[in-house]
Amino acid sequence: MDVVVKIAQLLVSLSILIVLHEMGHFVLARIFKVRVEKFYLFFDAGFSLFKKKIGDTEYGIGWLPLGGYVKISGMIDESMDREQMKKPPQPYEFRSKKAWQRLLIMLGGVIVNFLLALFIYILVFFSWGEEYVPVDRIEWGYEFEQELLDLGLKNGDKILALDGNEVERWVAIHHDIVVNETQVIKVERDGSLLDINVPEGQTSKLLKLKFGLIPRVPCELDGLLKDGNMAKAGAEINDRIIGVNGTPVGFYDEFVDLTRKETNTSFELSVLRGSDTLQITASTDKDGLFGFSPKIYLDFFETVVVKYSFIQSIPAGINRGFDITGSYLKQLKMLFKPETKAYEELGGFIKIGSIFPSTWDWERFWNMTAFLSIILAIMNVLPIPALDGGHVMFLLFEIVSGRKPGDKFLEYAQIVGMVLLLSLLLYANLNDIIGLFKN
């Protein structure tokens, strides 16, 4: 059921973004009196699920959910309609319009996607505001993934600054270390200040981080599996584990370190229940689990809720949109640095779908839709033939040089671009499949 909800959110989100992206091309084409022959959500290779012709335009839904398109008269695009291009240009065709008009038509989808992202972020701030745990309330420091521990960080460290920039939100630490390729991490450890120097060439390892870090918390039971080993041992909700086989335990990560990879093994656990300390014996199962879920940081630290008026939400939403855009451009840049091996983390529809929550949450849905809208805008403006950016590149050449590239050249460029895009699509989704088997 979780997978179905994720797929549904992905399809709804992409459908919204694709329709509005193509609408950007469509509206500008009609403004400049260019005929649009087709307007499709998803591709209709061979057949369509639905179609209806209104005026000069056929509107439809294809069966292949890899995108969508508008077929603009007199334009060399993925339809590769050579017969139409052999005929004399007509006043209603794309090729008969001025270069600046054609440029605006090609930029229409990208502009709509970017403005849509800003609009969504504004509405998210207005509707839900922000809720977060201030860094000064995270009193026990953080628990780190192994790749960060390998840098010299220790569980319990409080991260104060990255490359001299004070940390404002703990959720951004993981992102900033990786994307900004942080060189110096300032931490507080046992009351002392330390600088952790990040060696060069760590990006490829850090890109493999899943959660990076989370606030460190005591090991308290939040849920017990019915008939699980911990429940059978007599444990209760809200019990705090403070010792394992005589070794004191202050935090959940310490409990995991003492019991991990031990299958079908009994442990003597010291448990704090209210003001009483109890001793219980609990065993791991064949998977090395006790059958309980721990409390998380939100159970220990009070959050701050910030509400925005509509006027206040406008700059907040715009800033969020530009921040996300800048971050994604930095991540995209990593793909062209072989030493980072960022290409190994490239994912397709499975990876995109996995970022949606397993339950339908409108705030997270709209945040993810805005994020994907920015990705769609950036990817489409890349100067690759067959993408909007490829057409923009050739139009800018025409405007600057005064010479229009020949139709044959544009046809060949379109073919090369389509092959490149299909190869990237295949590679990204193959990465997803390989990742599923690895997991």
Residue ranges of predicted features:
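Residue-level signature of transmembrane alpha-helical entry/exit and packing/kink sites
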Residues: D2, K6-L10, K97-M106, V110, ...
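Small-residue-rich helix-interface/hinge motifs
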Residues: D2-M85, M379-S401
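Alpha-helical transmembrane segments of multi-pass membrane proteins
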Residues: L14-I18, K71, N113, L372-V381, ...
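Short beta-alpha junctions and helix-cap segments that line functional grooves
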Residues: F50, L107, W170-H174, V198, ...
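Internal alpha-helical transmembrane segments
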Residues: G68, I72-E143, S423
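Juxtamembrane extramembrane loops of integral membrane proteins
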Residues: M75-R82, Y92, K97, Y142-G201, ...
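Functional transmembrane alpha-helices
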Residues: P88-K97, K210-G243, T247-I378, M393-V416, ...
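PDZ/PDZ-like domain segments forming the peptide/carboxylate-binding groove
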Residues: V124-E168, K205-G243, T247-F251
